[in-house]
């Protein structure tokens, strides 16, 4: 009789086999909303709502949590790592036709946050998952720490001035004050630098100047971008080898083979389109860089 319970939700035998590999039937009976990993939540909720044999009051907490998980996961699927609490309230109220009050939703959110297993509070308005909270904290700490480390200049002051003057002659126009300041700053060999600016502000020219500057120190240089098109554009504009970030990290379709135990073998890495890289990939990239030897410019 217990096994017949699951047929209330699906008669797909292969799906049922997969469900029972993960959950015991007793667990499913106790919380049928755990089936959201396999079955659409609206379908689960419809069965429970229309079946008088279910104790709706006992399942209320699990129901709310299921909708919280669904809302947060949909937000993440849309490439956002944080979700407004208010959006969760609105989502659940809309999906349940105002059958659940805000105070109950707030209570379940607070319990999940206090639990610390799934949800983390960013501030009073925003939430994220524990996973992305840890990923983005790792990024923040790594960037802040390495942005302060200097390994010593590539060229002395006189040599750098001569280098910039030579670049201006070769390219046929002068660097503006900001571009010269950037080259002076990057000459200090900080572990991490960022190059910001809108299209047409001279980022590519500055990046070319940085790459040529580093070429005086090492030939272990690589450029990478999120997309193949951007990667090809960098190669055309700078003359340096350029690949996608996935290729840089030696992605084989299942895993990234450049990682904490197998660091990238470069002295200088230029990453364009870094703003298009999601948090997870950005963290994987940082983890694969050996900052004892490597400096990175993100643009």
Predicted regions and their residues:
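Conserved ATP-binding/catalytic motifs of P-loop helicase motor domains
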Residues: 1-299
């Amino acid at each position: 009789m217990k096994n017949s319970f699951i047929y209330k939700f699906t008669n797909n035998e292969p799906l049922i086999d997969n469900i029972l590999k993960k959950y015991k039937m007793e667990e499913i009976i106790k919380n049928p909303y755990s089936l959201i990993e396999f079955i659409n939540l609206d379908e689960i909720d419809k069965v429970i709502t229309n079946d008088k044999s279910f104790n709706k009051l006992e399942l209320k907490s699990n129901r709310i949590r299921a909708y919280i998980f669904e809302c947060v996961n949909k937000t993440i699927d849309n490439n956002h790592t944080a979700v407004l609490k208010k959006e969760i309230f609105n989502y659940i109220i809309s999906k349940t036709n105002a059958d659940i009050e805000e105070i109950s939703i707030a209570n379940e959110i607070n319990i999940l946050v206090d639990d610390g297993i799934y949800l983390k509070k960013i501030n009073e308005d925003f939430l994220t998952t524990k996973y992305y909270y840890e990923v983005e904290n790792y990024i923040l700490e790594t960037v802040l720490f390495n942005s302060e480390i200097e390994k010593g200049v590539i060229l002395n002051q006189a040599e750098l001035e001569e280098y910039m003057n030579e670049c201006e002659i070769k390219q046929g126009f002068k660097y503006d004050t900001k571009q010269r300041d950037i080259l002076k700053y990057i000459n200090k060999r900080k572990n991490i630098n960022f190059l910001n600016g809108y299209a047409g502000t001279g980022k590519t020219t500055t990046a070319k100047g940085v790459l040529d500057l580093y070429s005086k120190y090492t030939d272990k240089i690589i450029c990478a971008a999120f997309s193949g098109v951007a990667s090809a554009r960098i190669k055309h504009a700078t003359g340096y080898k350029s690949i996608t970030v996935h290729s840089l990290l030696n992605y084989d379709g299942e895993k990234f083979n450049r990682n904490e135990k197998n660091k990238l073998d470069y002295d200088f890495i230029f990453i364009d389109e870094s703003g298009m890289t999601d948090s997870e990939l950005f963290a994987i990239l940082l983890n694969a860089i050996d900052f004892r030897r490597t400096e990175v410019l993100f643009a």
